[in-house]
Regions:
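N-terminal alpha/beta PP-like core and its mobile active-site loop of ThDP/TPP-dependent enzymes
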Residues: 2-343, 383-386, 466-469, 506
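Generic enzyme active-site microenvironment
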Residues: 161, 303, 391, 444-445
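Phosphate/pyrophosphate-binding active-site segments
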Residues: 1-3, 139, 175, 198, ...
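Thiamine diphosphate
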Residues: 102, 111-117, 268, 312-314, ...
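Active-site nucleophile and cofactor-binding loops and adjacent substrate-binding regions
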Residues: 27-29, 48-59, 74-81, 136-138, ...
Length: 565
């Protein structure tokens, strides 16, 4: 009988394998050592990526999940190891990213005694995770993992935290594979009301000036094709949120660009001119709506979403179509008449012309010798034939990349949208290379964000991860400086940056690099970067006080976008 028993740590490994896990991002330590010992015997099936900081593990798991559609996994120890993942957990929660964080914990006999590296991880993470649970017995491992993966990946995805007591790791138990399929108190996908489907279709069929707002929910629901058919049948222009940018190809004739504070003029201004606003898998966050008191007050609103909590949270809706958007979009489309809104669609051209003249042309073809941020981004996008996965950090690099990178394929943008986490980019890009090893991964970073998790260059070196790092170096914390210039009378309070030599740092990690100042150097360096097997760091020295435009001022309406500073 004893031969049939295995440790809780071994049960953890088998449970992860049963869930189809192949990649784990982690960092060992005292309270999780029995599990890492079990992992030693599973290296042929479970590829463990040793990060250099636990925050890096959480963000790498996010990057992996976002590009692959699978659940990302990270494995860390208790105390500081666990708390170092908190930012990644919060980031995953607000951006609906499915990850499972497994952290060691002191033995149950030591709980509540302030033991070495004891921290109440369940208590800390309950507000920022879909489910937090402490595994106290080895016999609970299999069902806890099954439930964790089910909750993380079903409905609106998100992070799950498992606090794995040390005694549960070493206790013996009988293992039986478990697959969670139902939890009575948890309804991940609400039932779709047929009446709401009919009402939505009727409103769309009779609408003048409809506008579709495309969110990340389209990609989370693998509904890109359903979205395309939906907008084409009714001839409806669309704008995409930051996280929804690759849900619709950039060059689709009905894709009118990005929504939000630094988005395109057309979809932003016409939000306040449309007669019907159709939100699909987006949550009306403040960066998209601007001043809610003036947002789309003239329009009827239809909201497609899988999460009932998002309906009427920020914007009052007339019709809520709840459920999986892949199914709900198809259901509504089946009731739509073929329509034409030629005059309405053409009205976007006026704003496109203004933006081209006032913003895009000066950014992509600057009059000065200095490189602009936008021309670097567009050059990389064109060199990859617009097929690369774009990962960004946070700051000006994020907004400029989102504006000037083009998207032709699904799941092609990975960025920290809701939490805005500087330091996200580098580890997320590592995760993306493991999630989609068949695709080129380019990460754009500022000189500020690059230094926040720069230790992950060690992970890139060890794994030979083919991350193409583009540092837009302007010697400033650029986004904060832009706000200081626009709203704080150019008082640059602690935003100028004295930077290290990034090429020397890259060399220390045995990563090829290039620093460029001119357009001629940029083209040569991009070609070298993309032809290099493995990682590469391209430092583009851009104009120091460049700004990301247009911009909705804080507290302003979406139709009050600024075209100059």
């Amino acid at each position: 009988m004893s031969k049939d028993l295995i440790t809780g740590a071994e049960a953890m490994m088998r449970s992860l394998e049963h869930q189809g896990v192949t990649t784990i991002f982690g960092y060992p330590g005292g309270s999780i050592m029995p599990t890492f010992d079990a992992l030693y015997d599973h290296q042929n099936t479970l590829n463990h990526i040793l990060v250099r900081h636990e925050q890096g593990a959480a963000h790498a798991a996010q990057g992996y999940a976002r590009v692959s559609g699978k659940v990302g996994v990270c494995l860390v120890t208790s105390g500081p190891g666990a708390t170092n993942t908190i930012t990644g957990i919060a980031d995953a929660m607000i951006d609906s990213t499915p990850i499972v964080v497994i952290a060691g914990q002191v033995g149950t006999g030591f709980l509540g005694t302030d033991a070495f590296q004891e921290v109440d991880l369940v208590g800390i993470t309950q507000p920022i995770a879909k489910w937090s649970y402490q595994i106290r017995r080895a016999e609970d491992v299999a069902w806890a993992i099954a439930r964790a993966f089910y909750i993380a990946s079903s409905g609106r995805p998100g992070p799950v935290v498992l606090d794995f007591a040390k005694n549960a790791q070493v206790e013996k138990t009988k293992y039986e594979p478990t697959q969670q399929e139902f939890i009575r108190s948890y309804v991940p996908v609400p039932d779709t009301d047929e009446e709401s489907v009919k009402a939505a279709a009727e409103l769309i069929n009779n609408a003048e000036r409809p506008l579709v707002l495309v969110g990340q929910g389209v990609e989370l629901g693998s509904a890109q094709e359903e979205l395309r058919i939906f907008i084409e049948k009714a001839d409806m222009p669309a704008g995409c949120t930051l996280l929804g940018l690759s849900a619709l190809p950039t060059d689709h004739p009905l894709n009118k660009g990005m929504l939000g504070m630094h988005g395109n003029l057309g979809p932003n201004i016409n939000t306040n001119k449309c007669r019907l606003l159709i939100a699909v898998g987006m949550r009306f966050d403040d960066r998209v709506t601007g001043n809610l008191a003036t947002y789309a007050k003239q329009a009827k609103v239809i909201h497609f979403d899988i999460d009932p909590a998002e309906v009427n949270k920020n914007v009052k809706v007339d019709i809520a179509v709840l459920g999986d958007c892949k199914k709900t979009l198809a259901a509504v489309t089946g009731l739509l008449k073929k329509n034409r809104h030629t005059e309405w669609v053409d009205s976007f051209k006026e704003y496109e012309a203004v933006e081209e003249e006032k913003v895009i042309r000066p950014e992509l073809h600057p009059a000065t010798d200095s490189l602009s941020m936008g021309e670097v981004v567009r050059a990389v996008s064109e060199a990859t034939r617009h097929e690369a996965i774009l990962v960004t950090d946070v700051g000006q690099n994020q907004m400029i990349s989102a504006r000037y990178f083009k998207y032709t394929r699904e799941r092609s943008i990975v960025t920290s949208g809701g939490l805005g986490t500087m330091g996200f980019g580098l580890p997320a890009a590592i995760g993306a290379t493991f999630g989609r090893p068949d695709r080129t991964v380019c990460v754009f970073m500022g000189d500020g964000g690059l230094q926040m998790n720069i230790q992950e260059l060690g992970t890139i070196m060890e794994q030979k991860a083919p991350v193409k790092i583009i540092c837009l170096n302007n010697n400033y914390l650029g986004n904060v400086r832009q706000w200081q210039a626009m709203f704080f009378n150019h008082r640059y309070s602690f935003t100028p940056m004295l930077n290290p030599d990034y090429m020397k740092i890259a060399s220390a990690y045995d990563i090829p690099s290039k620093r460029v100042f001119s357009r001629e150097e940029l083209k040569v360096a991009i070609d070298e970067m993309l032809s290099t097997d493995g990682p590469f760091l391209l430092e583009a020295c851009v104009v120091e006080e460049g700004n990301v435009l247009p911009m909705t001022p804080p507290g302003g309406s979406v139709n009050q976008m600024l075209l100059e500073c």
